[in-house]
Amino acid sequence: MRPQSAACLLLAIVGFVGATEWWESGNYYQIYPRSFRDSDGDGIGDLNGVTEKLQYLKDIGFTGTWLSPIFKSPMVDFGYDISDFYQIHPEYGTMEDFERMIAKAKEVGIKIILDFVPNHSSTENEWFTKSVDSDPVYKDFYIWHDGKINNETGEREPPSNWNSEFRYSAWEWNEVRQQYYLHQFAIQQADLNYRNPAVVNEMKNVIRFWLGKGVSGFRIDAVPYLFEVDLDRYNQYPDEPLTNDSVNCPDPDDHCYTQHIYTQDMPETIDMVYQWRELVDEFHVENGGDKRLLMTEAYTSFENIMTYYGNGVRNGSHIPFNFDFLTSINNASKAGEYVEHIKKWMDAMPEGVYANWVLGNHDNKRVASRFGVQRTDLINILLQTLPGHAVTYNGEELGMTDVWISWEDTVDPNACNSDPDNYYARSRDPARSPYQWDASSKAGFTSADHTWLPVADDYKTNNALQQLRAPRSHLQIFKKLVRVRKEPSFRQGELNIQAIDDDVIIYSRQKTGSDLYVIVLNLGSTSKTLDLTKYYELGTQAEVITTSLSSQYIDGDVIKSTEFVANPYVGTVLVAV
């Protein structure tokens, strides 16, 4: 083995402990319920639709599924604006439907993880209504401020220059209370005040409630926004400094126009994550059963992400999502960039925790659209053969692509706050189109004539049923990957990875005493003939476990290790024979 890989190999051993609990080295599937399966014919996915398809997920081999928000909501931000944290959204079903889903999940052996949205509530939440009325219990449940008077005009203005993620001021005037409230997302999503112990306790009660209903954990949304800087001695909030980026962010209404040093990543945020971990651990001790899981969503600095795991004294998130492949890698990235980001994560992890890899979600363009349809299998091979946890967004296993959605049909508030010329770049709707189950009307998603978002045009040739029936398909490759990922060398084996040129990544996975696997990924547009024995003790021959649809090889082929052909955009998993 080449000396340059030795450090990575050693760190893989340190950072990748032996899997013993259900969640360790898990394979997780994100369901966007509104688009997954509609059971009642209203054009909107629901819980009974999820229940109906749990066996499908189990047959693929997933450990668990996390559901985007299912709680009662006005649906301004499609569930991320919660009006009652203790109720199911009526379009999705009833509490009885939820309990039936939990029972079915236990029957088939798949874990249910809920999306927990702690930063804000809907302005239609009873808490907010009472806060507007200055109810003594709820008066300080949200971030309220009088604003400031403009010395030149004499008019009242927002307290600071903070902008919302969805553009424009993050402060909204309330006529009843005669104050501004903070909303870091939509106007209808009021930020909760985590400096108020009553808020902290209430949100812990929400966690306890759903744990009591039988969920196996939570994916925690938008964690960096939990706390804002405290008021200064003059009872004011400071303006954030400008980014002064006239090229990438010239519009003063955009969120990127300021540096978010007062509205994100406050030190108290990490402590809150640790408190939630203590809560779920205590629940496990008190109630038994399997351990409960915390995943965290935080688009933040790499250094911050590592603190989410824990600080050596207190534990934090089991899975602080690794978004490097979303934020730092694209279809033009070279092989060395992939390897650099993989090594960076593996090198930095605290001892005794697991890596994780997130390649897609409901907030980003789909994998096949970002990296190219021709790389669909290659990217899934990468995801499923790296150490640690794999997180798949619904539809990526089929190679679903983004759907073009007109300005008139756009419903995402992030895009709707833009204009007809710029909305599409901001819109998250294209990645949220209905799941493509079969070639029947509306892709088998619904019996309705209309769906909440348009169905993709290619559903008749690209759907789950067609791919299940085909001898070779994206889904068949994905299923093979999930199966082989359960082998000891993938669950507990060493990682030895390198880029041999700008296009080709090669790495091995092996546990002592178990099979040696070699993975070859050719990101480029030209074939490469490789002598794999120069890099790994593979022997003269190797067997193809699985490979991309466009490969010249098929599963089961025995190839010469010294003359392996890596076709363009093809990934291949090999095992020594």
Swiss-Prot record:
SMART domains associated with the record: Aamy (SM00642)
Task: Write down the Pfam families for this protein, in alphabetical order.
Answer: Alpha-amylase
Q: Which GO terms describe its molecular function?
A: alpha-1,4-glucosidase activity
Identify the keywords attached in UniProt to this record, alphabetized. Answer: Glycoprotein, Glycosidase, Hydrolase, Signal
What GO biological process terms are annotated to this protein in UniProt?
Answer: carbohydrate metabolic process
EC class name: hydrolase
Which residues are annotated as site, described as Transition state stabilizer?
Answer: D363
Record EC number = 3.2.1.20
Q: Which reaction does it catalyse?
A: Hydrolysis of terminal, non-reducing (1->4)-linked alpha-D-glucose residues with release of alpha-D-glucose
Residue positions of the active site = D221 (nucleophile), E297 (proton donor)
Q: Which residues form the signal peptide?
A: 1-19
Q: Which InterPro entries match?
A: Glyco_hydro_13_cat_dom (IPR006047), Glyco_hydro_b (IPR013780), Glycoside_hydrolase_SF (IPR017853), O16G_dom_2 (IPR045857)
Positions annotated with a glycan in the UniProt record: N119, N151, N244, N315, N331
- Which family does the entry's similarity section mention? Belongs to the glycosyl hydrolase 13 family.
Q: What is this protein called?
A: Maltase A1
In its UniProt entry, the species of origin is given as Drosophila melanogaster
Q: Gene encoding this polypeptide?
A: Mal-A1
